[in-house]
Amino acid sequence: MRYFTKVLLLLALIVPLKAEQPLGLKLPTANDKIFSANPEQFYMYTTRNFEGVSSKPWTAGQYGYVRNLKRTDEGVIATRFHEGIDIRPVKRDKAGRPLDLVNAIADGKVVHTSKVSGHSNYGKYIVVEHDWGSGPFYSLYAHLNDITCKVGQKVHSGMPIGKMGYTGAGINRERAHLHLELNVMTHTEYPKWHAQYFKSKNYHDKFNGLNMNGLNIAELYIRHQRNPNLSLISFIQKVPVYFKVTVPRRGALDIAKRYPWIRIGNHHGISAAWEISFSSSGFPLAVTPSNRAVIRPTVTYVKPTKSSHSYHTKGILTGTGSQASLTSVGERVIALISGSFME
């Protein structure tokens, strides 16, 4: 019986749960300039005033640290992270309102619609769940004028699900755009975490943006165009690690149960802790058993930098050089991914 159990455990470690499927990605609108020599025709700009100079950089519509410039020991760096991409409209009516239809980027199922613009900075938005064989991924379509799909509805790649708009915080008609993300979900019990840390009402159940971690969807589109057989796992594996946090082990992590690619090493063995690897945006890249004994979440690696780590980690870390510790924001983030809020 013991031998049989060991065999089952070994099989669980080496046999994938499901074969990865082709992504079949399509752009969500008629704007395809992301693949051209003129990306400024694809991305929507933001207004900027830095050191007395006003500008409208289209680059601020890209994914990554592209906003809120600061002059530091490393020079001028952008310190505000943008989780997705902002796509310009290609059609407007006489009043300047966008006419672009918004389409599903891949086959999936609608799992959330937010039809009241005041309930989120996203304005009116849609979340579609996709299963490519590597755990559930969630595309998010924000600042919509209209939503034409329903929760539970199956959608196909390229199928219209809404109409571009300018709902949500800080957006006017001139800057109307589609904000697009592709995310993993941090924890399925997010509402409990939200209730513990925030007084504001959570209108979005587990599909709240704070529970979503977005990957670089622009880079994914470009690499997918070059290689239609690209897998999400191979894409994620190339994302560099910026920091690692080791947490006391109190059972399997919720995120590791849903995303087999995140599990590194023997998760069925005994260890004192989990070491979680993150990108600079806080995107979880790996969960590895660790024999390091910790009584609280501890930063065990950080990429050295001359400026504050807070500028490079969405405020999750503080410190400089090769030294870092969690901020209060970081402690909340780690509580969510580790599930310590459930204790």
Report the location of each language-model feature.
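Hydrophobic h-region of N-terminal signal peptides that target proteins for export
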Residues: 9-18, 39
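Sec-dependent signal peptide recognition
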Residues: 2-10
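Conserved, short, structured surface segments that act as functional micro-motifs
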Residues: 120, 124-129, 143, 153-228
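Surface-exposed, glycine-biased beta-strand/turn segments
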Residues: 20-124, 166, 203-343
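Zn2+-dependent peptidoglycan hydrolase active-site motif and core
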Residues: 97-99, 103-146, 173-179
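Surface-exposed strand-loop junctions at beta-sheet edges and helix termini
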Residues: 105, 149-150, 155
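A short, hydrophobic/aromatic-rich structural module that often spans a beta strand
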Residues: 130-141, 157-160, 164-166, 231-243
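Small beta-barrel nucleic-acid-binding modules, principally OB-folds
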Residues: 83-94, 142, 182, 187-189
